[in-house]
Amino acid sequence: IFLNALTTPIAQELLNKKIVMDILAMKTRDGELGLFAAMENNHPLCVTRFLSKINGIAFKYKLSKANIMDLLKGATAHGTPVLYIAMSKGNEDVVLSYISTLNIFAKKYSFSQRQLFTLLAAKNHDNMSAVHIAIHHNHYKTVKTYYAAINVISQSLSFSADELKTYL
């Protein structure tokens, strides 16, 4: 409901891009975004709706590609991306939701391959990728879901899954 309010005409008159970014990037006391909590606790519908709202808000407030990338990465104060935490927990449903939605953002905002791969690799502050942490925790089904989602979006974005693997 709150994110819906940001897209109303009156909000657009009262709010500027900086205020909207501050609202979207609000963090808990632990330095976590709302998207992080949804990914960590395996709430795919929340992830899909939040990212959908970001998509609409980004357009209305003319957010930069860098702003959008920061919101999609959703990193904690320690630099842990949202996809990394979902993979480390074995939350395959949100992994699928997140990657499927990235496809929409990548097309709409013309992400470079490097930008997309940065989000998909989801490396932590120690440079460990989301795939590696999932394997480390024996979340093989989540890794399988990850690569299946990658294969789907790779066809529409013209890259091969092997290209991404070399980036991991």
Positions of the model-derived regions?
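Ankyrin repeat domain, specifically the short helix-to-loop turn at the C-terminus of the second helix
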Residues: 3-23, 49-71, 97-119, 147-166
